[in-house]
């Protein structure tokens, strides 16, 4: 899975999964996020704009990140995906109620 991580600024990082976020690729994203947390990152922007598909494994990684980050006093923001199917899935599962979304 291709994951783009932009420069950290004041313990904030933007992570942009570029491929499907599913049971096969979710462990790679989880590992990347774990490494960033170990490096002291507190605030995450997860850019889903280029994510064409997401299943429950991908959503579980995001929920886990949100829990861990809130416990550490950090935050998680999600960039709305362009793929209508992913956007609809996030709305149906009410992710838009627990995460802050930006365009």
Q: What does each of the following model-derived ranges do?
A:
Residues 100-103:
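Short acidic-hydrophobic, aromatic-tinged amphipathic segments that line or gate anion-handling sites
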């Amino acid at each position: 899975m291709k994951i783009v991580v932009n420069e950290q600024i004041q313990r904030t990082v933007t992570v942009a999964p570029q491929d499907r976020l599913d049971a096969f690729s979710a462990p790679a994203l989880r590992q990347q996020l774990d490494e960033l947390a170990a490096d002291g990152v507190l605030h995450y922007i997860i850019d889903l704009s280029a994510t064409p598909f997401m299943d429950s494994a991908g959503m579980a990684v995001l929920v886990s990140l949100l829990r861990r980050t809130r416990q550490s006093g950090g935050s998680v923001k999600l960039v709305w995906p362009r793929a209508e199917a992913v956007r609809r899935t996030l709305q149906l599962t009410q992710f838009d109620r627990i995460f802050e979304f930006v365009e």
